[in-house]
Amino acid sequence: MEKTGNRKKHASLRDEQAIFRLLRIAAAAAGVIGTLIAVWLGCIGVSCLSWGIGDRMADTIAASLTGLVTVAIVSICCWRALIVFIRMVGRLSQGSAFTLENERAMAAIAFSLAISGAAILAAFVLLLLICREMVLTMIYLLLLALAFFGVALLAHALSLLVRRAAVLQRDSDLTI
């Protein structure tokens, strides 16, 4: 009976390690795909700079530079969040789930995503002033900013949950 229990325990540990490995791979893949999208958007922004000749030269250049700066800020913040996430998954795979270090990691992820949302929202406002005729693009930008803020809010809530669980676990360890 005891051997069966040990086999199940080892199988579940292998399954957990596989899940953590898959999470790290997925995060790295998201980083690569995100970088490719950022480079593609950057190329579009640079090519739009060359279109800035004629009547709307200042508007086109301002819109292109706004887009390039926004893509750079969002890319840096998302990479920071991904790196923090990958490190946190490493700690989780070692069995340390409810720690203050993981709480700080979730808070850092939330902060990075909130900065990304704020950058997109600032770009939305600037582009609204510059390019009034791009209504559909503006709606997409607003929805993207809201998505970043929503995920940042969830990450912040999880950081608070992990903080409380870490305190409870520490108190429980001290009691034992």
Question: Can you say where each PLM-predicted feature lies in the sequence?
Answer:
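Alpha-helical transmembrane segments and their helix-start/interface "positive-inside/aromatic belt" motifs
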Residues: R14-V32
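Membrane-helix interface motif
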Residues: A38-I53
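Membrane-helix boundary elements
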Residues: G54-I83
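Hydrophobic alpha-helical transmembrane segments
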Residues: A58-L68, V135-L146
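Membrane-helix interface/capping segments
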Residues: W79-T99
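Membrane-helix boundary/juxtamembrane motif in polytopic membrane proteins
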Residues: G95-L113, Q169-I176
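Alpha-helical transmembrane segments and their membrane-interface junctions
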Residues: I115-V135
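Alpha-helical transmembrane segments and their immediate juxtamembrane interface regions
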Residues: I139-R170
